[in-house]
Design a protein with these regions (language model features):
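Conserved alpha-helix/loop element of class I SAM-dependent methyltransferases that forms part
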Residues: 16-21, 34, 50, 55-60, ...
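Generic detector of short, locally flexible boundary/turn motifs and exposed helical patches
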Residues: 4, 55-58, 77, 102-103, ...
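Residue-level detector of alpha-helical recognition elements and their boundaries
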Residues: 25, 52-53, 93, 119
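Conserved nucleotide-cofactor-binding alpha/beta core module
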Residues: 81-157
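N-terminal auxiliary segments of SAM/dcSAM-dependent transferases
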Residues: 1-50
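Conserved short-loop catalytic and cofactor-binding motifs
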Residues: 26, 63-66, 92, 108
Length: 157
């Protein structure tokens, strides 16, 4: 399946899931900004290469270190429930490979992301840069990798 078709299918699955849960989430559909972000950010770029054929399936995928990238519906739902406004800043604990941070950077003014596992944080930095979320230099005495994504830019410590 081509990426465009897989992404469109993923969006349809997310929309159907939101509609199915409309009573629980209090609305018939997720915020269009979140759906746009989900369609814009290439999920296959945030999973290990051997799992890229499954990137748009509505399943969590292993990313190493006994961690997973959440299934697309959960990423969309969590992001929607944050009700992010254009001037909001968001803190993410646990960067993983950067997918959630890339999604959050679409509706938010700034995203702070703290990597729990340094190796994943370094991989996330590279993947986010490839998506145009380049770092803004920042000093930090923290042993953890921290990034700030700001409308197309990111800050790492």
């Amino acid at each position: 399946m081509k990426v465009a078709n897989a992404s469109e299918h993923m969006l349809a699955v997310i929309a159907a899931g939101a509609f199915r849960l409309r009573d629980a989430i209090g609305k018939n559909a997720l915020d269009e900004r979140i759906m746009t972000a989900m369609g814009k950010v290439p999920r296959h770029e945030f999973v290990p290469i051997e799992l890229q054929p499954y990137a748009y399936d509505n399943i969590p995928l292993p990313i190493g270190f006994a961690k997973t990238i959440s299934q697309p519906f959960i990423v969309a739902l969590m992001t929607d429930l944050l009700d992010i406004k254009a001037n909001d800043s968001v803190l993410e604990i646990g960067t993983g490979l950067g997918y959630q941070a890339a999604i959050l950077a679409q509706p938010a003014r700034r995203v702070y992301s703290v990597a729990i596992i340094e190796e994943l944080g370094q991989a996330a930095k590279q993947r986010l840069r490839q998506q145009g979320l380049a770092p803004i230099p920042k000093r930090s005495k923290s042993p953890r990798s921290t990034s700030t994504l700001s409308r197309g830019r990111s800050e790492w410590a």
